[in-house]
Amino acid sequence: MTVETPPIPDDATPMMAQYLAIKRAHPDCLLFYRMGDFYELFFDDAVKASAALDIALTKRGKHAGEDIAMCGVPVRAYEAYLAKLVRSGFKVAIGEQMEDPAEAKKRGSKSVVARDVVRVITAGTLTEDTLLDARSHNYLAAVAEAQGTLGLAWVDVSTGDFAMQAIAPKTLAAALARLSPGELLVSDRLLGAADFFDVWADWKNVLSPLPTARFDSENSRRRLEALYGVGALDGFGAFSRAELAAGGALVDYVELTQKGKLPRLSLPKRLAEGAVMEIDAATRRNLELAETLSGERRGSLLATIDRTVTGAGARLLAAQLAAPLTDPHAIEWRLDMVGFFVEHESVRAQLRETLKRCPDVERALSRLSLGRGGPRDLANVRDALAEIPALRMLVTQSHLDTPPGINQCARELGEHSALVDRLQRALAPDLPLNARDGGFIAQGYHEGLDELKGLKTESNGLMMRLEKRYQDETGIASLKIRHNNIIGHHIEVPSKQADRLGEGYIHRQTMANAARYTTTELIELAGKITGAADRALALEMELLADLIGEVTARAAEIALAAAALAGLDCASALGEMASSARWSRPRVDDSTAFDIRGARHPVVEAALEAARSGPFVANDCDLADSQRLWLVTGPNMAGKSTFLRQNAVIAILAQMGSFVPAESVHMGVVDRLFSRVGAADDLARGRSTFMVEMVETAAILNQAGPRALVILDEIGRGTATFDGLSIAWAVVEHLHEVNRCRALFATHYHELTRLTSRLAALSCHMMRVKEWQGDVVFLHEVGAGAADRSYGIHVARLAGLPPAVVGRAEEVLGILEKSDQASGMARLADDLPLFAALAKPRPAATALPQASPLEEALKAVNPDDLTARQALDLVYELKRLL
C-alpha cells in the first residue's frame, strides 16, 4: 500500500523538510514520526490512520497553500494502535528521535532533532507479545522460482524458526494453507504469472511484492553462508536453487525491516518432499482444523485438543496438527512420547504444573537478540530456565521406561544454573515495563549503582527538608516542590500567595491558579538529584546490556532448551487429552489399511458432553482393499457428514502423533487428504456454490493417488437432478477405476448403489433409522446396505415448516414415488389442486378420556434425558402397552 509523498518545497520548515525526506524513503509505510511523547502522522498518512484508528484528525500548518492533516498517538500506548493498523493491512515505519533536544540545540537554535527510521513493522515481522497471539505462529513466507521449480521458505521472526521446502507448482496452494503466513513475499515476475493467479488471489491481503532481483539464488546462497558462518550450506541439507532464492530473499527482507538487525534464526531446516500429509485449503476449512467456518478458534479441532500450558507448546501443537507426518517411524516416535504421559499420570500432572511456571522463552530470546528486549524478557528467560532441573528429574527417574523422544528432550534442556543464578541476583523483584524507567537492577548486585541510588535517595530527602524549610520561611503551607519534564524541579504556590515570596525566589511560570518559582539552592540540589538519577540509569543500562549479551551468547543452547520445553508440553498435553477423553493409540504403517473401530468425532463429542446431550454414537469404518470406496446413503440429520469428517480427523490425529477418539485404529499412511463437504460460494471470483463444488472435486480427481483419503459429501446436489446424478455417477467410477484411493462418498442419489454390480471395491453403507407411526428415529449408526429413503420431509417438519407445506410435500412425493419421474411431473402439473385448495379445516377438539397406562408412561418420561437408544427402547415399551 504505497502512499503518495508530497514534494519538499523550498519554503518548508526544517522539521517538515525532515519529515518529507524520511517519508520519501518509505513510501509504502505509514510513518510514525516521533515528536516528544507522541508519534505524529501527517498528510495522507494521517487521513488513513485516523480513519483506521478512529482518532481525531487535526491540522498543523500549511503545505503548498493547503492545511497539513495531522493525527498522533502517545508513545507509551502506541502498540495498541500499531496492532490495529497492522491488522488493517498497513506497514508502519517507526521514526525515532536519535538525539536529545538539548544536543540538537548545541548545533544552533533552529536545528532539528535528528530522526531516522529504526524499524519497519509489517504483519510478518512482529515480535511484541501485545501484537501477537501467544498460541499461534506468525510466519513470514517467501516463494521463489528457479529452473522451473518452486522454493518456499518461512520464518517466525518472533521465535527464530526457519525452514525451506522445494515444492511442485500444483502443491503451492496446499503448502501455503499449511503455513497460513501473516505476510507473503513474491517476486514481481512470479506475481504476474498466470499459472498462479488463483493462488495469489487467496493471499492477496498479505502479499508483499518485491523486485525479482531480490530472489537471485547465487546471492542468496552467499547471504545464507555468511549468516551462519559456513563455507557451504550442504551440511544443513541439499537445498535447491529455488529454495535458496526464497530463503535469501526472506532473510534480506527481515534485515531490511529491522534496519540492519537480525533475530536469532535457527539453522535452516529442510522439509523433504512428501514428508507431511498434503491437505489443501478447502479441506482444512471443511474439517475446521484450526478455525470454524465462521473464523473462530473455539469449536475447531485445534481448540478441542489443545491442553497445552505454555505458548510455545501451543504453537508446536498447532504446527503438528497442520502438518501430519507420513513417516511411520517418526509417527511412532511421537506416539511413544504421548504414550509415556498416558501411562504415567503422576509424572504428567507434576510436569504440567511445573511447565505452567515457564514463560515464553522463544519470543523473549528473539526480542533480546534484536536489541528490543528488556528486563522482563530477561526475567522470562530466568524463570523458565530455573524450572529445568525439576523437569529433568521428573522425566528421568530410574524406575521409568522413558522413550527416546523424552530422553532427547531431557538432554536438550541443558544446564543453565550459572546463568539463572546471575539473573536472579541481578534483577529486581518488581521490574518496570520499559528499561528507560530504571529500577530493574537489584540492590546489592553492583556497588557503584547502590551508591548512586543512595545519593539519589539522600537527595530526595534533602528536597523534602528544603520544601519544609520554604514552607516555614514563607508561611505558605501549600507550597510544594514539584517536577515535570519541561522545567524540571520548581516551587509551586497558589497565585494569590505569590507576593509573600522573597527576593531569592526566581519566577519561572504563571499558571491559571498557581505560580512557579525556583531558587539558586533548588537549582543546585536538583542538579545533584538529576545527575545521580541520570548516572544511575546509565549504569543500569550498561548492566542490562551485559546481561543481555550473556543471554544472547548462549542463544543456541537456550533455544534448544525452549524447544525441549515445548516438546514436553505438547506431548504431555496430548497425553492429558487421551487420558481424559478415553482415546486409544493408533497403529500407522506403510499398508493401505484403514480399519477404525468405535470412532467418534472429538469436537462433536465434546459439544455433546458440554451440553449433557447424551453419549456420541461410535461407528466403524473399514476401507480394506476389497471395499476401499464406501457409498454412504441415508437421511439428512442422520450423521453422514459427521461420519465422513470423523474418519478424516482421525487420520490427521493419528499421523500428527496423537492418540485418537476410537476403540482401535489400524491405518496405512495417508499422503494426501481431500474433503469436499458443505456448500459455499465464492462471490469474489464470480463462482457459484455449484462451481466451487466442481472446482474442488476436479482438484481431487486430478491429484488423489492410491495413498490418498477422500471424503465427498453429496456431489452434484447443486444442479438439475439428472445432471447431478450423472456427475456423481462419473465421479464414483473415476475414484474407483483411476484414483483407486480410499474414499467415503455420501449421497442422496440412491441410484448409485447399482454400481456395486460393476465396481468390485465399491461397498454400500447406510445411516440406520427406525420408523414408528409416521415418525422417524435417527440412530446415528452406520450399517451395511443401502437406504431407500432420505426422509427429507421429516426433517422439514422438524425444522418447523408449516403443516400445510409438509402435507403438500407428502402428497407430491406420493405421486412421484408411484410413477416414473417424468410422468409424475406431468400429473403434478395437470391433476393436483393448487396449494391454497389443499387447506382443510382441523377437527374440533374433544374431551380427553381417562388416562390409560400408555399415557401414564408417557407423562413419566422427559424426552430431553433420553439417548437415541433409550428412545428406541421406549418406543417398543409403549407399543407393548397399546
Curated annotation (Swiss-Prot):
The keyword DNA-binding applies. One of its GO terms (molecular function) is ATP binding. The gene is mutS. Signal peptide: none annotated. One of its GO terms (cellular component) is cytosol. SMART domains: MUTSac, MUTSd. SUPFAM superfamilies: DNA repair protein MutS, domain I (SSF55271), DNA repair protein MutS, domain II (SSF53150), DNA repair protein MutS, domain III (SSF48334), P-loop containing nucleoside triphosphate hydrolases (SSF52540). CDD domains: ABC_MutS1 (cd03284). It comes from Paramagnetospirillum magneticum (strain ATCC 700264 / AMB-1). Keywords: ATP-binding, DNA damage, DNA repair, DNA-binding, Nucleotide-binding. This is DNA mismatch repair protein MutS. Transmembrane segments: none annotated. One of its GO terms (biological process) is mismatch repair. This protein is involved in the repair of mismatches in DNA. It is possible that it carries out the mismatch recognition step. This protein has a weak ATPase activity. It holds the Pfam family MutS_III.
